[in-house]
A protein has these predicted regions:
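Juxtamembrane/interface motifs at transmembrane-helix termini
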Residues: 46, 142-146, 182-187, 228-234
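C-terminal effector-binding regulatory domain of bacterial HTH transcription factors
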Residues: 207-253
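Short linear motifs at protein or domain termini
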Residues: 1-104, 111, 230-234, 244-253
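Conserved amphipathic alpha-helical segments that form helical-bundle/coiled-coil interaction surfaces
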Residues: 98-179, 190-199, 208-223
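An N-terminal domain-start capping segment
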Residues: 69-76, 140-145, 205
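Short helix-capping and inter-helix turn/linker motifs at the boundaries of alpha-helical repeat units
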Residues: 4, 187-188
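Short amphipathic alpha-helical segments at helix-loop
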Residues: 26, 86-91, 134, 178-182, ...
Length: 253
């Protein structure tokens, strides 16, 4: 119960910061005011503030109170920060930064995966791909399998730092996939592109793997641009992952 109260308070305050209710550079209201507004104790408020400091959203100091830091200092690899931004609305700048990060990290990662992936690594990536295909053919959660696919590639590098990055990138990648696959037939059209990446890794061809992942990322970027061009407001991801409906017999491999 105490943990739920703490997590709920962190969530309310974090989202209030990210949505701009407490703008960058502003000072949070005094503890008594926050206690009254949220219906929690001072101890809960203080612990929540500590959590938000750890996430890079706040700083405290003598005579300045608790102040909201600039967005550049927020921990964008923190799943909570990404979730708050996703609920608030995904700006073009946020999505641009995310796609640029993918283009920097994933091509180099799949080159290493093509050189180092074990039989077990490949089996796990194959299983993720099978989950993607099944969700298209019979309906289901495509995005979770898509995330497993990409995180499997990162783990297959057998680089400890990249493996840690795969955990941190999880929320960011899921955000990208939720937007890019929201177009009609988006998942079905991206499935062969994923297959090309997997085949190149199986064939131990770093160059082909790199080219294939770049095509995949650029295709996702085009899908995101299409989604943004048809939105009257910034897309948000406050709901559970979209479930695909079953389709007619799939032609994708």
């Amino acid at each position: 119960m105490i943990r739920n109260v703490h997590a709920g308070t962190v969530d309310v305050l974090g989202e209030a910061i990210v949505t701009g209710r407490y703008p960058v550079g502003s000072t949070l209201p005094p503890e008594p005011m926050l206690c009254g507004e949220l219906g929690v104790s001072r101890t809960v408020i203080r612990e929540a503030v500590k959590s938000l400091i750890a996430k890079g959203l706040l700083i405290t100091g003598p005579k300045v109170g608790t102040r909201v830091l600039a967005e550049e200092q927020w921990n964008w690899f923190d799943p909570d920060v990404v979730a708050w931004q996703s609920r608030a609305g995904l700006s073009r700048d946020f999505l641009r930064d995310l796609q640029e990060l993918r283009r920097v990290v994933e091509p180099a990662a799949v080159r290493l995966a093509a050189e180092r992936a074990t039989a077990q690594d490949i089996a796990e990536i194959e299983a993720a791909y099978a989950g993607m295909k099944l969700s298209i053919d019979e309906g289901g959660d495509y995005v979770s399998s898509d995330l497993r696919f990409h995180q499997g590639l990162l783990r297959a590098c057998h680089n400890r730092m990249v493996a840690q990055m795969s955990k941190a990138l999880g929320a960011l990648l899921r955000t990208s996939f939720e937007i890019s696959t929201s177009r009609p037939h988006g998942p079905a059209s991206s499935l062969p592109l994923h297959r090309a990446v997997l085949d190149a890794v199986i064939a131990r061809s770093p160059q082909k793997a790199e080219r294939a992942i770049i095509v995949l990322i650029d295709g996702a970027n085009d899908d995101i641009e299409q989604v943004l061009s048809t939105c009257r407001k910034l897309p948000s991801l406050g709901q559970p992952a979209r479930q695909l409906k079953a389709r007619a017999k799939a032609s994708a491999r």
